[in-house]
């Protein structure tokens, strides 16, 4: 399955999610041993080239400076990146910050975390509205049959007869499986060039190979479907 598609696949604004859901238990605080480290919120001097938006701060959590993050993917479906990454980048309007994360854990369908330098509820509450980014290199490794959506965006799609079908422009999660949005050049009713879209289920019966190195996906799908 896959996580939520943010609909913005530009560099540094990529959508996020994994293909196959795996159950993950996060009863214990991740990396709790780092809680004694010191740090603070800092203005982001450099924005990572591989920054991927993974959620947004929606509320304070508790009284000791923890924040609650609504994630674009649940734990086990890609949201684990928030639990693994020890450094987050935050954006709200023109304001950009970087912060070290002391502790984090899954909480219901959200992630709660303690940013370094945020010591009380008021300071945590003031962080509402920040969009949360982590580096792609901080994503947890996936099994051979799993893919992050961010890695599929822009790949060429061809069928088994090597007919070009377009490029992956986005992904949709319909609650049962993922669906690729494949854009291709077309001609409008007025004869002018336009862009059309194919929707191809991202399931094994249709998706035969995903070659990220070659940036190509081979599917069992005809051009006139």
Curated annotation (Swiss-Prot):
Q: Which residues form the PRC barrel domain?
A: 144-225
Q: Which UniProt keywords apply?
A: Chaperone, Cytoplasm, Ribosome biogenesis, rRNA processing
Q: Return the InterPro entries for the record.
A: PRC_barrel-like_sf, PRC_RimM, RimM, RimM_N, RimM_N_sf, Transl_B-barrel_sf
Spell out the subcellular localization from the entry: Cytoplasm
Q: Does the keyword Chaperone apply?
A: yes
UniProt key word Chaperone: yes
Please give the record's comment on domains.
The PRC barrel domain binds ribosomal protein uS19.
Record note on quaternary structure: Binds ribosomal protein uS19.
State the similarity comment: Belongs to the RimM family.
This chain's protein is named Ribosome maturation factor RimM
Q: Which organism is the protein's source?
A: Burkholderia lata (strain ATCC 17760 / DSM 23089 / LMG 22485 / NCIMB 9086 / R18194 / 383)
In the UniProt record, the gene name given for this protein reads rimM
């Amino acid at each position: 399955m896959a996580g939520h598609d943010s609909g913005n696949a530009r560099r540094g604004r990529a959508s996020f999610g994994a293909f196959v859901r795996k159950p993950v238990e996060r009863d214990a605080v991740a990396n709790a041993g780092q809680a004694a480290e010191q740090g603070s919120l800092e203005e982001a001097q450099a924005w990572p080239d591989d920054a991927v938006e993974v959620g947004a701060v929606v509320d304070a959590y508790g009284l000791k400076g923890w924040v609650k993050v609504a994630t674009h993917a649940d734990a086990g479906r890609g949201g684990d990146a928030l639990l693994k990454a020890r450094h987050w980048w935050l954006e709200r309007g023109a304001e950009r910050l970087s912060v070290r994360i002391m502790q984090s854990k899954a909480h219901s369908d959200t992630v709660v975390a303690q940013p370094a330098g945020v010591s009380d509820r008021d300071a945590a509450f003031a962080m509402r509205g920040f969009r949360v980014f982590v580096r792609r290199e901080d994503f947890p490794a996936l099994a051979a049959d799993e893919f992050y959506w961010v890695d599929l965006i822009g790949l060429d799609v061809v069928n088994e007869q090597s007919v070009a079908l377009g490029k992956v422009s986005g992904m949709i999660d319909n609650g049962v499986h993922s669906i690729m949005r494949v854009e291709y050049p077309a001609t409008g009713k007025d004869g002018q060039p336009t862009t059309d879209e194919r929707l191809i289920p991202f399931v094994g019966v249709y998706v035969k190979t995903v070659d990220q190195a070659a940036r190509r996906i081979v599917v069992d799908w005809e051009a006139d479907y």
